[in-house]
Amino acid sequence: MLMKPIIFTLLFTAISISFTAQIGLDITAKGQFNSTWLFNQNISDDGAEQDYAPGWGSHYGLGLGMRLGFFGIGMETNFGKHNAEYSGVIANQDYASTVALSTFQLPLFLRFQNKGGVYFEMGAQYNRIRKALYTRENLFPVSSDVSGDYAKSYSTALIGFGINRKILKSVPLGFVFGVRLQYGIKDARGVDAYGLPLDNTLFYPNYAKTRAASAGINIGLMYTIDTKEKESGY
């Protein structure tokens, strides 16, 4: 539900800008390396039997932005992995498990950038789960497709900051380096560290939502088409 008002706000802003002034266009090719997590209160409450471990994921894609001076709006289309890692001890037996989500991501955001290229961004991201794979090691090793236990899609709120610097003054190509943080708005559902569905009332009488979270480093190249370069200074 949150995505719709954000989309309408971005579209209204874009139309308003286009009627009042010429705009700059930013085309970006980028990748991001993330620390990724899937948080659920029922897992958190299970102590040493189910514990979180650092998970890592990445994505890559293309972005398009519209800019007027310091203010801009943008969107991206990305493909990537969001992985959640777990570890625990059952009957003195250690185990480790992983949930690997293959996702399509559509972030929409507002961006504020000064003349030095430093920027701050905030918005929301639509995440489509293309596939979910669960694996467990040491304790009864298993690998299974758990896509049916996850929501078809979920959304996250995002904030980020970084810098966009031109490589050469004579070339409208910049190097982008930044950090982006995300946290789940909608329930991603899913399985626990054992691979059991989190909506199974036999194991979890009190249902708890699953929140996807990530923190990562953005690296990319941005090509700028600036219709008022001399006037704006960007």
Where do the PLM segments sit?
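Short glycine/proline- and aromatic-enriched beta-strand/turn motifs that initiate or cap beta-hairpins
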Residues: 21-76, 222-229, 234
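Sec-dependent N-terminal signal peptides
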Residues: 5-15
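Outer-membrane beta-barrel pore domains and translocons
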Residues: 30-36, 78-80, 125-127, 178-184, ...
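Predominantly the C-terminal beta-signal and adjacent terminal strand-loop region
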Residues: 152-234
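Sec/Tat signal peptide C-region and signal peptidase I cleavage site
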Residues: 15-21
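Positively charged n-region of N-terminal signal peptides that target proteins for export
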Residues: 1-6, 22
